[in-house]
Amino acid sequence: MAREFSLEKTRNIGIMAHVDAGKTTTTERILYYTGKIHKIGETHEGASQMDWMEQEQERGITITSAATTAQWNNHRVNIIDTPGHVDFTIEVQRSLRVLDGAVTVLDSQSGVEPQTETVWRQATEYGVPRIVFANKMDKIGADFLYSVSTLHDRLQANAHPIQLPIGSEDDFRGIIDLIKMKAEIYTNDLGTDILEEDIPAEYLDQAQEYREKLVEAVAETDEDLMMKYLEGEEITNEELKAGIRKATINVEFFPVLCGSAFKNKGVQLMLDAVIDYLPSPLDIPAIKGINPDTDEEETRPASDEEPFAALAFKIMTDPFVGRLTFFRVYSGVLQSGSYVLNTSKGKRERIGRILQMHANSRQEIDTVYSGDIAAAVGLKDTTTGDSLTDEKAKIILESINVPEPVIQLMVEPKSKADQDKMGIALQKLAEEDPTFRVETNVETGETVISGMGELHLDVLVDRMRREFKVEANVGAPQVSYRETFRASTQARGFFKRQSGGKGQFGDVWIEFTPNEEGKGFEFENAIVGGVVPREFIPAVEKGLVESMANGVLAGYPMVDVKAKLYDGSYHDVDSSETAFKIAASLALKEAAKSAQPAILEPMMLVTITVPEENLGDVMGHVTARRGRVDGMEAHGNSQIVRAYVPLAEMFGYATVLRSASQGRGTFMMVFDHYEDVPKSVQEEIIKKNKGED
C-alpha cells in the first residue's frame, strides 16, 4: 500500500488540558468536522467517542489517551486525547514523548489551572510546540483576555492572540481573525454555516491594537521581520503566518485562539491553525539514540528510506484482539508479518497485525510509514518506552521518564478463586501502566499496589473487577515514603562463616554519599589491584540494591544514594557471590549509624479556590497540615491559594474544605517533590512500623 499522505502533510498532535476544560469535547468536534463521526457525543452524557473505557464514560473524564487519525485540508492529523486529571500524568507524559505538537485547551473562565501548569511544564521539557485554544467562550464568566493574561503570569509563556472573540457568554457569536483582519460570524448551531464579514465597527479599535501587538511579538522572533518592522515597512499576511509558524515550531511563541467546542464555534479555525502552525515530522530535529553495539550516538531522520525505528509508548489490553502496543514510527517502513528487534530488551518480536486506531474502533492496515502512529498486535516482550528497530540497524531511542508512585494500598482477594485471577489481572494492568506498581510484602505476604493518587488506584481496582472479574478487599490508602542518607560515611561489611566443609567469606569497604534528588542509586567500582575479584563486584551491587529496597529506618525503599566500593579482601576457597552480597548489606547497615538516614515524604502542590470570606480558614488548614503557602491571587470573588503540603496530611481534606466553605471551595493537588519529614514525624513513622513488625 503506497503512502497516502506525505510527511509534509502529516501532523502528530496531542490535546492537553486541565480536567474539565472541554478537551474531549474539542476532540469530538475535530472528529465530527473531519468526517470521522456522524453524530456528536457529549462528555456529560457519557457518549463521547474518545472516552471509550466504561469508567471514563461513567466519570466523564479521560483516563487513557485514545489515539485516532483524521483528515483535514488534505493533511493527515493523528490525534492523541490525553487525560487532564493529575493522577494520570504518565498518560500525558508518554503521549508528549511521541508527539510533534500540541493543542492546549483552556477554560476561558478559569484560564491556566494547576494541571495546565503540569502538562505545560512537561511539554516544555520535551520541547513540544503548542497552540492554545481558549474554550468555553459561551460559559458564564468567560473572559478571553483574562485567560491570555494567565498564560503570561502563571506560565511565563510568550503567548499572543491570533484571534479575538465577538461577544462572550450567551452573546458569543463569532471570531475576529487578526491575520486576515476579517470577522467569522456563526449563523447556525452546528458551526457549519460561517459568514466572513468585515470586523464590526465596535471591535475595530481593539482588533487593530491586538494585530499591532501580534506583529511586534512575531517580529521580535525573526531578524528579517524585525528590520522590516523597525523601518516601518508593511509585513504581509503571508510573512506574518510564516513568522508565526517558524516561532511556534521553535517553541518561542504560542498562538492563542478562542471558541466554544460545545457550541461548535472556532473548531475548524483551530484545525486550520494545527495545519498552519504546528510542525510536520520533517520540521522537528531528527530523533537521537544510542547504537547498542558501539555505544555511539546516532540519529534517525524522518524518512521512509532510513532504517526502521519506532518507540512503543503505550500498552493496552483490548477485549477483542488482546494485547495492543501503540508505537510511533520515527523512520523507515514496517509491514505486518515482519520481524523487528526490541533493542531495549534485546528480544526479537514478530509484528502480527497493524491497526490504525479510531478511539475504540480499528482498521487493519498492512504498512506503516515514518511519522505514523499505529498499534501492533502480537508483541510479547515490549513494554512502554521500548525501542523497536530494524534488526540490521540497531538503535535505542530515549525512553519515557516514569514518575515514582506516591500512594499505596493493600488489596486482598475475596476468595481462593479470586487469588489466582488477581495475580494475572495486576500483572496485565502493570504492563499497561508503568506508574502502577505491584509488590508483595515479604513478611506479611500481603499484596501492595502503588500509584499516582487515589483516583488512579480506584480506577485500576475498578478495572480489575470489571475486566478481569476479580473481587478484592481494599485497604485504606497509605503514603509511599522513601529513605535516604543525608551525610557521607565509610563503612565495612565483613561476613565470615566456618562450619565444617566450605565456609563463607566476604569483606568490603564502601563509601556512601548522598546523591542529587531524582538521581536514584548509583554504584561505582573503585577497586584497584584485585583486592575484591572482578566476578564478585556485581554481587556487591546486587546486595546493596536488595537491602535498599527495605531501608534502614522503617523499611521504605532507599533513593538518591551513591555507593563507591573502594577496598576489601577475599578468601581463595571460601569467597562466593552470596558472601559478598551479605557483606554489602552489612556495610549498608553499618553506614546507617553515621550517614544521618532520613525518611522522605511526597510533597503535593495544592491549589485551593475559595470564596474571599473563607481565605482565613484555608490559611489555617495549610498551617495545621504542615504546609507552606507559596502564593495567592484574587480571581473575581474567589481567592486562589497555592501551597506545598505533605500528602500524608491531605487525606480527607475534601470533606474539611466542603464544610468550611459550604460546598463552594475546590482544590486540586499534584505531586511536586520529596522532602525530609520533621524529626517528630519520623519517630512516629518508625514507631508505627516497628509496632507492626
Swiss-Prot record:
GO terms for molecular function: GTP binding; GTPase activity; translation elongation factor activity. One of its GO terms (biological process) is ribosome disassembly. GO terms for cellular component: cytoplasm. Pfam families: EF-G_D2 (PF22042), EFG_C (PF00679), EFG_III (PF14492), EFG_IV (PF03764), GTP_EFTU (PF00009). SMART domains: EFG_C, EFG_IV. It is found in: Cytoplasm. Residues 8-282 form the tr-type G domain. Keywords: Cytoplasm, Elongation factor, GTP-binding, Nucleotide-binding, Protein biosynthesis. Belongs to the TRAFAC class translation factor GTPase superfamily. Classic translation factor GTPase family. EF-G/EF-2 subfamily. This is Elongation factor G.
